[in-house]
Amino acid sequence: MNKVASVILSVLVLICLSCTEKREMTLAQYRNYIEAKGGGFCKTVTAGPLIYTVQYRPPLYIAAAEHKWQFNDSTEMKTRTMALGGIVWFNVRIGTVSGATNPLKSDVSGVAEYNDRLNYWLTQAANHFTLYYGDLELKPQGYVFENSYGLISEDVVVIGFRLPDTTPVRPLRLEYEDQLYNTGIIKAEISMDVLQELDHIQVKI
């Protein structure tokens, strides 16, 4: 084997090792990593007077949140995480650009309009969310609107979609066609490169 071929082979071996090497994190570090603003798992879209923050919630993230970010052991963590496979979940936070007013109350003309807005989020909005997964168009399997009752300046939609795969093997593009504030179609994509990063993270208990 000549020197050039030997160097190329060495570089390829190093690349393979770096691809398979696990990045260790504590649960707190993992939470910060997933929630990082501007990171690959949290997308912010500004549309007119509103801000939509789309947070992808991997199974481990959900399992840890259920256990208040503290597991008894790794078996408990793995068991619950595996049970959550096959459905992808997002939190969609809806706030105003000013941050001074809750979207349900922003420029509302009165109680009747407020109730119409609330009814829309409770009973209709789920029909206007679509997850594009490769060539598939998926509609929600789970939907909850968490009403803050105007106590804070944002409300939250929790929405889930069942995949044909246990874990995503294609990019995830969430779209919401706004029928309430006329802000158009809101899009947020989690790329395959970002999703594959999860395979190289090892959380320590």
What is the meaning of each model-derived region?
Residues 1-19:
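Sec-dependent bacterial lipoprotein signal peptides
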